[in-house]
Amino acid sequence: MSLTSAPESGLAPLEFAVSRNLHTKSDAERAELLVDPQFGTTFTDHMIDVCWSVGGGWHRPRVQPYGPLALDPAAAVLHYGQEIFEGIKAYRHADGSIWTFRPDANGRRLQRSARRLALPELPVEYFIQSLRELIAVDGAWVPSGADQSLYLRPFMFAKEAFLGVRPANKVGYYVIASPVGAYFKGGAKPVSIWLSEQYARAGKGGTGAAKTGGNYAASLLPQAEAYEQGCDQVVFLDQDRNVEELGGMNIVFVYKDGTLVTPQSPSILEGITRDSILQLAADRGHKVEGRSVSIDEWREGVASGDIVEVFACGTAAVVAPIGVLKGTDFIDEQPLGELALSLREELTDIQYGRREDTHGWLVRLDG
């Protein structure tokens, strides 16, 4: 289930023009913001902007001050949703160096998303270079507190101005960054899950495997329903009542024989955190499977003791144990074990440089 591929070769690097922000935060202002950063509310001083056009390819790469984008009201993204994005973090290690985790996998996933949304495929080298270019000017924004990081958000959208259903001839690729703190204050806590049976996240042959905004927009109403039911997150089923994923995280079941099973389907986003967690589990000798898991197998497995642990995983939370599954006519307490949190600790230790990276997952962004 590895998502990592060999990088493309033979590409000359982009030559970024750098326009410095003349109104950057002072060291004192930035330090205050980094004390307890909230997810996605504070942004660094600069951003990446790269253009693409039919015939012109990728061109005019720039590092520029963070600020509003000028869009024509007829920009295709506003009408037809031709948009994709990624999420990846930069970590400050104890020696002050700045690293990221499996950026080649994120770059490949962005390419798959682009293919599905009829957008141009950004070379993985350019993807990684764009992260390095932003860190070169905004590296001071990478926090050093426990479980803190700089969340990097690459995204791409159709910006050609026209009305008509066709792939756009002009596209923009951007990267912005936001310092973030620990997802769970005081350590990872079990989350409660609402079973959505009225709504679907994605359909067969649809865009479920792409990281595109429409999938997340479709999850907002059922997520609101989950909140109304007193739950933290929502889990979706496919048309055959097989478990798919949460609104923004993959799900993993741990069976009493030590096997880890994760739902596998063309309509599920291939999670890089999930792939890494499963690799670490396999390194420990656990059997790992990707297959369909019905909601009945989940509930009956918990009731019989065959399933001994259930957890969700993703870039933001890393790993979140699932403590409760709630439906319209049931509330199932979920068994809590030690494996999820043990794997979470191992993964974050690798990301922050506290444990040896035997898989070559870390890539340095500074220096």
Feature map (PLM): residue ranges:
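Helix-start/capping segments and mature chain N-termini
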Residues: S2-V137, S149, F155, F162-G367
